[in-house]
Amino acid sequence: MKLKTTLFGNVYQFKDVKEVLAKANELRSGDVLAGVAAESSQQRVAAKQVLSDMTVADIRNNPVIPYEEDCVTRLIQDDVNETAYQRIKHWTISDLREYVLNDEVTSDDIAFVRKGLTSEVVAAVAKICSNADLIYGGKKMPVIKKANTTIGLPGTFSCRLQPNDTRDDVQSIAAQIYEGLSFGAGDAVIGVNPVTDDVENLSRVLDTVYGVIDKFNIPTQGCVLAHVTTQIEAIRRGAPGGLIFQSICGSEKGLKEFGVELAMLDEARAVGAEFNRIAGENCLYFETGQGSALSAGANFGADQVTMEARNYGLARHYDPFLVNTVVGFIGPEYLYNDRQIIRAGLEDHIMGKLSGISMGCDCCYTNHADADQNLNENLMILLATAGCNYIMGMPLGDDIMLNYQTTAFHDTATVRQLLGLRPSPEFERWLETMGIMANGRLTKRAGDPSLFF
């Protein structure tokens, strides 16, 4: 394994795989904050060259956190399909990138190969891709999952309806649900971020969400994004269960900072299978985001792209219905501006798909970032072109509870019409019965929530 290269007469030497992975990243403020970013564009190019020549085995055998020290590393390594790995272990990262982008390689071919990849290998591929590569490669890797709706089918584009309220006011939540439904949002999930994380409040909000779902016989699933243990307790006490949610991190220390253990995720999957109102086999929902490990002091000197890929390796083990990166939510300390946020969103999407998970993206930014709503619109169109499974939707994209800017209900409608995409098939049939959609297009009734009153 070579850890050095020569460019224009200058020798660039790296100490280990972790450093090569970090220096090969495109510039982002979080890596600068962590002290792991490339010191120059030349060093970045040199790291990309060294990384391109490394083999899949080189990187698998050198995880950024040792196997003996971290439960996430152990889970990722133990989940590798050894038959697939043996086929590709001598490929260079450049070979793997070319394979993913090759026109003659099918989605099924990639679906087999990705079983043999660890998360560090997945991250390595993203690091040597251009933005167009990230889009083209992501498009080739559909990941389809089933709850009450089917997500990820080619030609579809789904939306999480996000009716957050600063007081968990159930009337406000219901009103936002009706507005979102009138635009065709909500086929991924109707998911509320609660202000108060306790069983009683969670049950009250879930009852509101399912009150709407049941009244209008909507083929979707609900979720209140409290801590996983709160959700489990509420469901055991009789609250209506849809998807069970948890934010995850790419290291054991990061999970502990989130108050999470793998045993909790195991229990959530078991509870969901027993109690939840899900027609399909996928009942979990995870959120992630570049920089989360560093913000928790749990990145172990690794860069934020690699740590994000490890989130997806962890998620893959649980076969969730939904995973999305909340790409700009963590702030400019980690992704400084629209250029860095767009790059991260495209990286996260292809890394999720190459990990075999149902990948969405919250195209978003915080109010102190060097970004604006045009960023969100640019990113959502790029991601929809790349085959992203879903984005978020809320009134005008302004989340007054979480205090950040995301995408609006009408943005999903715009993308669908612009690119000829449709909701999940079960949800589209329901929209047709309500007179909101016909022949894949919104009708004149769309956008008017009064049709539910």
Which role does the model predict for each range below?
Residues M1-A174, S182, V189-F453:
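Anaerobic metallocofactor- and corrinoid-dependent redox/one-carbon enzyme cores
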